[in-house]
């Protein structure tokens, strides 16, 4: 199983409307340290670190949404604020963004809540020499989107122990994954007789999902893979009930 990567949505814009020929610029300069954000309840804030390994400075915009990837950042309402929401990251340098829970709306205290951290990396405009040579160009602003889990303080079950509490049941359509824990289980793979199941996805707390597989019977051995708190692949075995 390969590492999962967070989704990147490409947002296109043009500085000069291109005609027949158009120079192309597509560089993801700014990198986010980590692949997910865990926000423990009661903590004053959490820090997201950025690194710009490019030779040019970059402008970034950050915001949090509650599950709609198409939501306009100006109108997205979540109980978090990011400081600063817009920042210039100098070449070969880093930048820290501070996420603070405002408590503007009550969240469940018996399970995790899921939000998404967004970062839009806007590349710098080409210099005069580039424009003189190409005349027109197209830039791509790269948007990175990471899961942000708000974790209540009263959850006594360790998240790694919770992985072992999930029950897998044989069904005519495949495997029913029954997650009766307070944590999101971000599955990326399930093997039955060395064959990968389909429709493998994240399963929310106290909910179920069916992973499609053929011929699964009670007593069959299964192997699952999910992404843990550290962004690493976590493997485990289970017996279908």
From Swiss-Prot:
SUPFAM superfamilies: PapD-like, Periplasmic chaperone C-domain. It is found in: Periplasm. Keywords: Chaperone, Fimbrium biogenesis, Immunoglobulin domain, Periplasm, Signal. Disulfide bonds: none annotated. Its main location: periplasm. Changing residue 104 to S: In strain: AM30. The keyword Signal applies. Belongs to the periplasmic pilus chaperone family. This is Chaperone protein HifB. It comes from Haemophilus influenzae. The gene is hifB.
